[in-house]
Amino acid sequence: NRYISTIMKVTPYRPINKAIFAPIASWTEEKPYDGPSFGTNLERNNTTKIFNKHLEKACIENDLIFISIFDDMLNEDGSTNPIYLDDFGTGIHLSQKSMPLIIKKLKANKLI
């Protein structure tokens, strides 16, 4: 609830559409991350899926735009397709190959 309440406190100086960009799918063994992390790729993705469902519900209740490419980033088995993750060492950020997914969602929500 603090996540949404913080967004609701933002008072822009001009009218804007507030949007939440949901967390993305987790790093994969194909692009390993050496920072702190818990569980397998599937466990992390399942947790993110649950969080995103709660976040989407809260966005709807508060008239916020919810944008997610999470499901689009997954393989059929629920693992992350590494093509959407960066190639510059961390594997936890989006790559340029994710841009068409993002642009499609932004257009669908009339943000661009």
What kind of region is each of these model predictions?
Residues 20-23:
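Structural beta-sheet core signal
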Residues 11-18:
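A short helix->loop->beta-strand "cap" motif at the edges of active sites that frequently abuts
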Residues 27-112:
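Catalytic His-Asp segment of secreted/periplasmic serine-dependent ester chemistry enzymes
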Residues 1-6:
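Glycine-rich anion/phosphate-binding loops
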Residues 8-11, 107:
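Generic structural signal for well-ordered alpha-helical scaffold segments
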